Amino acid sequence: MTSILERSFNFNGFNCYGIMRHMGDNCYRCGYVQVSKRLPINTASINCHGGITYANKEAPSPLEIDDKNKWYIGFDCAHAFDTTDFWTVSRVSNELRQIVGQILSGER
């Protein structure tokens, strides 16, 4: 699998990453938010496309970040009928902003 960082940005103090994954002839996008380990988050209560499918202290590939005080939550756009035409870099970025908004508003 090949992974390419397509976009990184900071939204309200949270680093966000949009990544394209290539597996053979298929490709799909994922989005990740870097979160402080001190911030309690119930990932099951975050409303995003397909739900949170990644929650790990390791930065997702291809990111090379080694920060013991951070962890990462994310979602993927590899569900039935998902396409890269629909799940553009911009749409994934908007979904990441919504996740951050939920974290900040306490909807977690």
List each language-model region with its residue ranges.
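Catalytic phosphate/metal-binding cores of nucleic-acid and nucleotide-processing enzymes, i.e., regions
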Residues: 1-108
